Curated annotation (Swiss-Prot):
Disruption phenotype: A strain deleted of chpF and chpG makes rodlets. Deletion of all 8 chaplin genes on minimal medium leads to severely disrupted aerial hyphae that collapse on the colony surface and are not hydrophobic. A few spore chains can still be made, but they have neither rodlets or amyloid-like fibers. rdlA and rdlB mRNA are down-regulated. Deletion of all 8 chaplin genes on rich medium leads to a reduced abundance of aerial hyphae without rodlets and occasional spore chains on surface hyphae. Disulfide bonds join C67-C85. The gene is chpF. Belongs to the chaplin family. Short chaplin subfamily. This is Chaplin-F. It is found in: Cell surface; Secreted, Cell wall; Fimbrium. It comes from Streptomyces coelicolor (strain ATCC BAA-471 / A3(2) / M145). Induction: Not expressed while still submerged, accumulates during aerial hyphae formation on minimal medium, no transcript detected during sporulation. During aerial hyphae formation and early sporulation on rich medium, under control of ECF sigma factor BldN. Expression depends on bldB but not bldA, bldD or bldH (at protein level). One of its GO terms (biological process) is cell adhesion. The keyword Ribonucleoprotein does not apply. Residues 47-87 form the Chaplin domain. Residues 1-36 form the signal peptide. The mature protein rapidly forms a predominantly amyloid fibril beta-sheet structure at pH 3.0 and 4.2, with less beta-sheet and more random coil at pH 10. Reduced and non-reduced peptide have the same secondary structures at all pH tested, suggesting the disulfide bond is not required for fibril formation. The lineage of its organism: Bacteria, Bacillati, Actinomycetota, Actinomycetes, Kitasatosporales. One of 8 partially redundant surface-active proteins required for efficient formation of aerial mycelium; the short chaplins assemble into a hydrophobic, amyloidal fibrillar surface layer that envelopes and protects aerial hyphae and spores, presumably anchored to the long chaplins. Chaplins have an overlapping function with the surface-active SapB peptide; chaplins are essential on minimal medium while on rich medium both chaplins and SapB are required for efficient aerial hyphae formation. Chaplins are also involved in cell attachment to a hydrophobic surface. The keyword Disulfide bond applies.
Length: 88
């Protein structure tokens, strides 16, 4: 038997699912790769005014080591125990 309330709720669920999938596709489609260079090279060209367009850049070199970092409740059962990491 046809129940309009059930049809309405399924319609809302289907619309919500469609909207969620479209939003997820939009977020995934705009994701990109972040790339950075260690050198600071910039210029403020054709900037009218005394304080407009001033560029100050400071290159920061921090060695980051992310291999083998885990969080465990019991440290003796750490799955990364014995791993060796090097900074290239």
């Amino acid at each position: 038997m046809y129940n309009p309330k059930e049809h309405f709720s399924m319609s809302r669920i289907a619309k919500g699912l469609a909207l969620t999938s479209v939003a997820a596709a939009a977020v995934a489609g705009t994701a990109g790769v972040a790339a950075a260079d260690s050198g600071a090279q910039a210029a403020a060209a054709h900037s009218p005014g005394v304080l407009s367009g001033n560029v100050v850049q400071v290159p920061v070199h921090i060695p980051v080591n992310v291999c083998g970092n885990t969080i465990d409740v019991i440290g003796l059962l750490n799955p990364a125990f014995g791993n060796e990491c090097e900074n290239d």
